[in-house]
Each structure stands twice: as structure tokens, then as C-alpha cells.
Amino acid sequence: PSPAPPSPVPSPSSGWSTDIGHLLLSPTRTYAPVLKRLLTEKFADIHGLVHCSGGGQTKCMKYLPGDFLVIKDNLFAPPPVFEIIQRASGSDAREMYQVFNMGHRLEIFTTPGAAEELIAISHSFGIDARIVGRVEPASKKSLILKTPSGDILFDL
């Protein structure tokens, strides 16, 4: 049997503040001005940059320089467009976080001591930023995501 068709796309009348067309066609914010300043002023504090599109929240695992556990336990709430995609596709949370950035387009790996300065620079451009997790030594490359759907573990 064929799977049931996806449920209708939400509209503003169903509690969403915008329609699907506006969500999908809204421009993506560029991080170029922020990155220029960060790389100019704080280059030594930046240990890694990961653009999470095209690999989602697991993309960081490709660039770990050894066996480490990445724990992302303070993620931003996913924007509504990802709930729409999840409902329409029938994907589970694991697949969503593996495929999509879930609203986290850029990650900067740094030390705890430098993080607040980097966040302040981001805020000076009107871009929200925060510490979303930490990296710990481990016996293999692993990632734990703490999401509204529960903890999700990825191992390499």
C-alpha cells in the first residue's frame, strides 16, 4: 500500500505566523561581516568553523581532529519550517538533525574563555549566538544532541 499523503501545509489561519512560501523564500542571513571581524580580531581563538548546511548537526564530526565527544545540549529551538518539513516527510528527529541544520547554520569551535567575546561580536551585528555545547576527549568520534524530542546519539 502507498503511504498516506502528507498532511496539508499549515497556513497563517492554523496558528502559523507566516505561510510556507514566505518561510521557504525568505533570504538567508549572511555571516560574512561577522566572520570578517571574528577572523580579523579573534583568529587565534577560533579552533574550527563548520557551516552546518549540507550535513546538518552531524557535519562537525567530519572535522574532529581525533576521538572526541561533541555534546550539543543548548541548541536553539528549530524554526517552524523544520516542523513543516518533518510533518510532510514523515522523518524522525534523528533524520531531521542529520540532514538539516535545524536553524544552526554556523558553528564556531573555541575555548570557553573566548566564547563570550565571540558571542558579543555576533550580537553587535544583531545575530543571536550562544554556547550550544562542548567537546570532550573520548574513545571514538561521537555526537550527542539534546533536542526537544530527546537525546540523539551519533557515532562514527
Question: Could you describe each region identified by the protein language model?
Answer:
Residues S2-V9, S13-L25, R29-L156:
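Glycine-/charge-enriched secondary-structure boundary and capping motifs
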